[in-house]
């Protein structure tokens, strides 16, 4: 009888343990972290990571690199960062099939005013870059609300990354913010940015190298516009198969532009600007320049970088009266095979300094 009772008890306990196992596994699948240190140490033990009101210590990165395949990252509450002069980044995420998103009402606030001094990355305080999406492959970033980046917002070096409905609001930096690029893309393929809303003080989009890149349904306010480049002078100097469409650029220095580096070699090909609306542009509505040296135009173009297969279609709107509607400064023979349709930019001056304007385009 005692043996029978023992067997029954053992069976009952065994059944309970089996029943409990899925509950224990589920707990391991979902983790909530309230510190950057815990997130870094525990990031590979969870398939869903919730970052709850994290205060990242000064001089440290919220390190979410090397995540397990298929991990979901959720920003919850307010994510903030301690102050220190350093290069950053403040956030870094890498992995494959990663989903980065946020809970309702969440925000990520860089409090960039602590660094802003009007110098950006050119001097003054050393300012940390914000978000590295490097080797974040076959992944997505959705719905993030980002405020007040000290300098650059996203640095993207990935393959097959979709960024949807992200807001970067640096409107508080109108006076002292500088070089607050929203999306800088290099050495990447199949990057899709859809529905971005950007208030900043530099490029809304800057593609330095890469292929199969789209930017659609964007709103860019206060910065330097939608840019290819500057291209040249890096290890990768090819930009190809890019579509920038259905977007608005307002209250910005430039509307749409392509800029290449003086004396450099490379390729810009199969780039399309389509259905872009401009207003309140203060420098150039549409600009192509092949004269950049040390980040500034020289006025003398070179032809080592070819700019071919370019389409400007239905790029329309207005610039300020002291701005220039269109400026094209190409090297000899380097700008070819352009399609120019429905381009109407008015309100400013007509440039007398255009050179080597390709057939079909108008300056």
Swiss-Prot record:
Disulfide feature: 31-46, 204-220, 330-335, 354-363
Residues in PbH1 repeats: 158-187, 188-209, 210-230, 239-260, 268-290, 302-347
Annotated keywords: Cell wall biogenesis/degradation, Disulfide bond, Glycoprotein, Glycosidase, Hydrolase, Repeat, Secreted, Signal, Zymogen
Protein name from the UniProt record: Probable endopolygalacturonase A
Enzyme class of the recorded protein, top EC level: hydrolase
Subcellular location: Secreted
Principal location listed in the UniProt entry: secreted
Active-site positions on this chain: 202, 224
Catalytic reactions of this protein: (1,4-alpha-D-galacturonosyl)n+m + H2O = (1,4-alpha-D-galacturonosyl)n + (1,4-alpha-D-galacturonosyl)m
Entry EC no(s): 3.2.1.15
Originating species: Aspergillus parasiticus
The encoding gene: pgaA
SMART domains: PbH1 (SM00710)
Function: Involved in maceration and soft-rotting of plant tissue. Hydrolyzes the 1,4-alpha glycosidic bonds of de-esterified pectate in the smooth region of the plant cell wall.
Gene3D superfamilies membership: Single-stranded right-handed beta-helix, Pectin lyase-like
First and last residue of the signal peptide: 1-20
């Amino acid at each position: 009888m005692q043996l029978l009772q023992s067997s029954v008890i053992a069976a009952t306990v065994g059944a309970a343990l089996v029943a409990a196992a899925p509950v224990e596994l589920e707990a391991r699948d979902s983790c909530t972290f309230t510190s950057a240190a815990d997130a870094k140490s525990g990031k590979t033990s969870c398939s869903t990571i919730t970052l709850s009101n994290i205060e990242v210590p000064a001089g440290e990165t919220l390190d979410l690199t090397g995540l397990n395949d298929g991990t979901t990252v959720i920003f919850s509450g307010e994510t903030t960062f301690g102050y220190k002069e350093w290069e950053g980044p403040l956030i870094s995420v890498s992995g494959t099939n990663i989903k980065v998103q946020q809970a309702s009402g969440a925000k990520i606030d860089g409090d960039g005013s602590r660094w802003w001094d009007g110098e950006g990355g050119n001097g003054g305080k050393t300012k940390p870059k914000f978000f590295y999406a490097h080797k974040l492959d076959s992944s997505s970033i959705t719905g993030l609300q980002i405020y007040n980046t000290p300098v650059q917002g996203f640095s993207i070096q990935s393959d097959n990354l979709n960024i949807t409905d992200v807001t970067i609001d640096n409107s508080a930096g109108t006076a002292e913010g500088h070089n607050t690029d929203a999306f800088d893309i290099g050495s990447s393929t199949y990057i899709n940015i859809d529905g971005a809303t950007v208030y900043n003080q530099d490029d809304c989009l800057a593609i330095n190298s890469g292929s199969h890149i789209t930017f659609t349904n964007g709103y860019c306010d206060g910065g330097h516009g939608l840019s290819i480049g500057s291209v040249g002078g890096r290890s990768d100097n090819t930009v190809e198969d890019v579509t920038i469409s259905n977007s608005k650029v307002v209250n910005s220095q430039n509307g749409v532009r392509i800029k290449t580096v003086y004396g450099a070699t490379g390729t810009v090909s199969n780039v399309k600007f389509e259905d872009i609306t401009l207003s309140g542009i203060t420098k150039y509505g549409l600009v192509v320049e092949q004269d950049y040296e040390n980040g500034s135009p020289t006025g003398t173009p070179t032809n080592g970088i070819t700019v071919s297969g370019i389409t400007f279609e239905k790029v329309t709107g207005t610039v300020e009266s002291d701005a220039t509607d269109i400026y094209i400064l190409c090297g000899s023979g380097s700008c070819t095979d352009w399609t120019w349709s429905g381009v109407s930019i008015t309100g400013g001056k007509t440039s007398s300094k255009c050179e080597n304007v390709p057939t079909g385009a108008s300056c």
